[in-house]
From Swiss-Prot:
Biased composition (Polar residues): 284-293
BP terms from Gene Ontology: CAAX-box protein maturation
Membrane topology: Multi-pass membrane protein
Localization: Cell membrane; Secreted, Cell wall; Cell septum
Family statement: Belongs to the LyrA family.
Protein role: Involved in bacterial cell envelope homeostasis. Regulates peptidoglycan processing, perhaps acting as a scaffold protein.
Name of protein: Lysostaphin resistance protein A
Organism (species): Staphylococcus epidermidis (strain ATCC 35984 / DSM 28319 / BCRC 17069 / CCUG 31568 / BM 3577 / RP62A)
TM stretches of this protein: 9-29, 41-61, 83-103, 118-138, 153-173, 175-195, 202-222, 232-252
Length: 382
């Protein structure tokens, strides 16, 4: 399933409104076929109903970009591959039908052999236009909307049922209507498988298959005139090819899944085994889970390393405290050395003062002694 921006209510309303408008317009437009003056086998005006319904829904509901996600006109290798299949599968269906006619019927009837007053080019252009407007509504819009909430396979079933109701033909009896319903349903399922995992590039593939089938049926067989055998052959041929194509596609995807050890979503998005994966996790899922755990552990380790680097850049309080204490010890030691030096200077100064004082006293004493001696000598002489 795709990621959806639609609420559940809006999703349901878009599908419901599309269905109602399509069915109502198919009844209304049918009465205007004679008015436009174009034969029904060239262009059926009723086929405009899904196109108009899609346009109305796009204009009415929000998230228009998401509504138009199924209408991309770019080309990829996968689109070219599916285009080739869209042209080959109708050939296979018609070959099976022709073989059945040659085996079980006397002949087959060319439809309207007496009334083909329109050129082949006009018929081809008309069928391409019919295929485009129908598939724009049912594939590019409706199936795209359905795939936002459900698996591609089941979305194709829903679209197939709505398309079969839209094209139902009860004019020629119940049995004929039953085979016609089977034919249109398998017709739609084949297109649903063809457009799988094309990322919105659906319109080329769906239009090519649709136009190829309807254009060939204009000339071959006689189902349009109510021939039950023709309708039965076409319905069964389409069913055989459709079932075989879906089964082969599933087998190929399963082989790729087993050989590459990928999940089916990686092999092909929106696969119809996704619900089995949810219920029964495989070994590959377990290995992918373990790989995810390992990667998450590596991410955790990397985060721890980054945190350590970040913390290493932050100032550490304990380091600051140690640095401050070291600074204090250095300052105290410097102060002690300064005090010691100052005390030594004071002691040296005091010693120098004492020495100088003692020398002065001694000189005075010597002078006194000399004076006394001189006086004594003077007295003796008198």
């Amino acid at each position: 399933m795709k990621n959806s921006r639609f609420s559940g209510f809006q999703w349901a309303m878009m599908v419901f409104v599309f269905f109602v408008i399509t069915m109502a317009l198919s009844v209304i437009l049918r009465d205007f076929q004679a008015t436009i003056g174009v034969k029904r086998f060239v262009f059926s005006i009723k086929d405009l109903a899904p196109f108009i319904a899609a346009i109305v829904c796009i204009l009415v509901f929000k998230h228009r970009k998401e509504q138009l996600a199924g209408l991309k006109f770019s080309i990829s290798l996968k689109v070219i591959e599916r285009l080739l299949l869209a042209l080959i599968l109708p050939l296979i269906i018609l070959m099976i039908g022709l073989f059945s006619f040659n085996t079980y019927a006397d002949s087959f009837i060319l439809l309207q052999t007496s009334d083909l007053s329109v050129s082949l080019l006009t018929i081809l252009i008309g069928h391409i236009l019919m295929a485009f407007v129908v598939e724009f509504g049912f594939r590019s819009y409706l199936q795209n909307i359905l795939e936002t909430r459900m698996n591609t396979f089941f979305a194709s079933i829903v679209v197939g049922l709505i398309y079969s109701v839209f094209t139902a033909n009860t004019t020629y009896g119940v049995e004929y209507a039953g085979y016609h319903f089977l034919y249109t349903f398998m017709f739609s399922m084949i297109i649903g498988e063809l457009i799988r995992a094309t990322n919105g590039r659906t319109i080329y593939i769906a239009t090519a298959f649709h136009a190829s089938m309807t254009f060939a049926l204009v000339f071959l067989f006689s189902e349009e005139t109510g021939d039950l055998f023709s309708m039965k052959v076409i319905a069964l041929s389409t069913t055989i090819v459709g079932v075989s194509f879906i089964i082969i596609s599933l087998i190929i995807r399963a082989i790729v899944y087993k050989t590459t050890k990928q999940s089916l979503d990686e092999v092909d998005p929106n696969n119809y085994l996704s619900h089995i994966q949810d219920e029964e996790p495989s070994q590959e899922d377990a290995s992918s889970t373990s790989n995810h755990d390992v990667s998450s552990k590596d991410e955790t380790k990397q985060q721890d390393i980054d945190n350590d680097k970040h913390q290493s850049k932050k100032p550490n309080k304990s380091d600051d405290a140690l640095t401050t204490s070291n600074y204090k010890e250095d300052a105290s030691s410097v102060n002690k050395e300064t005090d010691t030096t100052h005390n030594d200077n004071i002691k040296d100064h005091s010693t120098y003062t004492e020495d100088r004082h003692s020398s002065v006293v001694n000189d005075v004493k010597d002078e006194i002694h000399e004076v006394e001696d001189h006086k004594a000598d003077t007295d003796k002489s008198h």
